[in-house]
Design a protein with these regions (language model features):
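Conserved acidic, metal-coordinating active-site core of Asp-based
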Residues: 119, 123-227
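Short hydrophobic/aromatic-enriched beta-strand-loop microsegments
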Residues: 62-70, 151-153, 245-250
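Mg2+-dependent phosphoryl-transfer enzymes with acidic/Ser/Thr/Gly-rich catalytic loops
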Residues: 2-5, 24, 195-289
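Non-catalytic pre-domain segments flanking phosphatase-related domains
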Residues: 1-11, 36
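Hydrophobic "anchor" residues on beta-strands that sit immediately upstream
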Residues: 8-10, 66, 227
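Active-site phosphate-binding/coordination module
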Residues: 25-133
Length: 289
């Protein structure tokens, strides 16, 4: 007998679920429908777990989002029961947390960031590369550099598996640096202001797959499938691997294309496009109330 299909919504945050003011209000209709049908929502972001956990404090619904942080390198699951039956199994029965932060069971490799810092500082000294990492800046300098508040800087600095660096050298040296770190098992994701150094074994699709694996372990009677949404090249690997993919157009950067041909392009930007696309998907799969 075939297992019943259950969907998981996996989404990027900035310029996808969140609008320019970092609000998901325009997606409330669909988020309400997802809650009513017990369809899990997973935030898959470059943000730290601490940043996202702070954001969940304004979450309006009972079922909290599951969190994938630092581009797939960290995970967090709510440690309280998700249903009304307090005797049901909880996530702590299926995973071993490395930390518990504000009601979330957090999973990450406790050694990887130290390994990254040790390696890049060695390479910087040996090759005279010109860059500074988050760990090199004072809090005051990061506030001035990023425009974040003191509190936001503290949350952004709470990294478990990556190190953002500000490259201050030539493009030639940058390309050489990228090639060298590959030999140590690391890679670089270049963002608008910072380049994120992380382990090569992680990306957003790996984080998504880890979540699906744990759902299959906890709820083995269902066939778990994913709908993924994102707006930037950093999301592409996640969208390529999802069962159903939605590309959100980006006002500033344009619209990315995927290798797969069966993806959906949202009709609007950010949370409005997110809301309409997921709602249409739910209706097409008869998942909507």
């Amino acid at each position: 007998m075939a297992k019943k299909v259950q969907w998981i919504v996996v989404t990027d945050l900035d310029a996808s679920l969140l609008d320019e003011s970092y609000s998901y209000e325009a997606a409330s209709e669909t988020l309400e429908a997802l809650q009513a049908k017990d369809i899990p929502v997973v935030w898959n972001s470059s943000k730290t777990l601490d940043e996202m956990i702070e954001m969940t404090k304004d979450w309006q619904w009972k079922r909290k989002p599951i969190l994938v942080g630092e581009n797939g390198a960290t995970l967090a699951f709510p440690c309280d029961p998700e249903g009304d039956n307090v005797t049901e199994a909880v996530w702590s029965d299926y995973l071993r947390a490395d930390a518990v932060i504000d009601g979330y069971l957090c999973l990450f490799d406790t050694e990887v960031r130290a390994d990254i810092l040790r390696t890049i500082h060695m390479l910087k000294q040996k090759n005279e590369f010109a860059f500074r990492g988050f760990s090199d800046f004072t809090d005051e300098a990061l506030v001035e550099l990023t425009g974040l508040s003191d509190t936001a800087v503290q949350l952004a600095k709470a990294r478990q598996a990556t190190e953002p660096i500000l490259w201050e050298g030539s493009d030639v040296d940058y390309n050489a640096f990228i090639q060298i770190i590959k030999g140590y098992g690391f890679k670089a994701l270049r963002g608008g202001q910072f380049t994120h150094i992380m382990h090569s074994k992680y990306d957003k699709s790996i984080g998504m797959a880890s979540v699906v694996s744990l759902f299959a372990k906890r709820y083995p009677d269902f066939s778990w499938k994913t709908i993924a949404l994102g707006d930037s090249p950093n999301d592409a690997v996640m969208l390529e691997q999802a069962d159903f993919a939605v590309v959100i157009p980006n006002k500033a950067k344009g619209t990315m294309a995927l290798k797969r041909k069966d993806y959906i392009l949202a009709d609007d930007y950010a949370s409005e496009g997110w809301n309409d696309s997921v709602l249409k998907f739910l209706k097409s799969t008869q998942q909507c109330i």
